[in-house]
Amino acid sequence: ASAGVAVTNLNLKPGHCVEIKGSIPPDCKGFAVNLGEDASNFLLHFNARFDLHGDVNKIVCNSKEADAWGSEQREEVFPFQQGAEVMVCFEYQTQKIIIKFSSGDQFSFPVRKVLPSIPFLSLEGLAFKSITTE
């Protein structure tokens, strides 16, 4: 099932992380993980693009407030393959979210609106197996 999945009671607090495991469809053009208040307000929109919107093998991150996008941050690290398993960990620090990959690579994205905890998570384009918090 690569349809969207949403969790509305995530309650991810600073200092904790959420780990997402799944598999990337063989014909995947891109997949996204969103963390935030709700579907209109994202602290982080994490979009891995194999071939989407003119980006090839790029990670594009952004924030969204009241359905308005912020400024994009592009990353060169791209530890994903179509048809492969994926594991990504998102660690919420008050001022930033650290994105960690099973490859050992990591980068961070600034938190533009601090929340006491992150209630909302959604996935698009990924056949997910598990979502765990620690």
UniProtKB/Swiss-Prot annotation:
<dbReference type="GO" id="GO:0043236">
    <property type="term" value="F:laminin binding"/>
</dbReference>
<feature type="binding site">
    <location>
        <position position="62"/>
    </location>
    <ligand>
        <name>a beta-D-galactoside</name>
    </ligand>
</feature>
<dbReference type="Pfam" id="PF00337">
    <property type="entry name" value="Gal-bind_lectin"/>
</dbReference>
<keyword id="KW-0007">Acetylation</keyword>
<feature type="domain" description="Galectin">
    <location>
        <begin position="4"/>
        <end position="134"/>
    </location>
</feature>
<comment type="function">
    <text>May regulate cell apoptosis and cell differentiation. Binds beta-galactoside and a wide array of complex carbohydrates.</text>
</comment>
<feature type="binding site">
    <location>
        <position position="53"/>
    </location>
    <ligand>
        <name>a beta-D-galactoside</name>
    </ligand>
</feature>
<feature type="binding site">
    <location>
        <begin position="69"/>
        <end position="72"/>
    </location>
    <ligand>
        <name>a beta-D-galactoside</name>
    </ligand>
</feature>
<keyword id="KW-0430">Lectin</keyword>
<feature type="modified residue" description="N-acetylalanine">
    <location>
        <position position="1"/>
    </location>
</feature>
<protein>
    <recommendedName>
        <fullName>Galectin-1</fullName>
    </recommendedName>
</protein>
<dbReference type="InterPro" id="IPR001079">
    <property type="entry name" value="Galectin_CRD"/>
</dbReference>
<keyword id="KW-0272">Extracellular matrix</keyword>
<dbReference type="InterPro" id="IPR013320">
    <property type="entry name" value="ConA-like_dom_sf"/>
</dbReference>
<comment type="subunit">
    <text>Homodimer.</text>
</comment>
<feature type="binding site">
    <location>
        <begin position="45"/>
        <end position="49"/>
    </location>
    <ligand>
        <name>a beta-D-galactoside</name>
    </ligand>
</feature>
<keyword id="KW-0964">Secreted</keyword>
<dbReference type="InterPro" id="IPR044156">
    <property type="entry name" value="Galectin-like"/>
</dbReference>
<dbReference type="GO" id="GO:0030395">
    <property type="term" value="F:lactose binding"/>
</dbReference>
<dbReference type="GO" id="GO:0005615">
    <property type="term" value="C:extracellular space"/>
</dbReference>
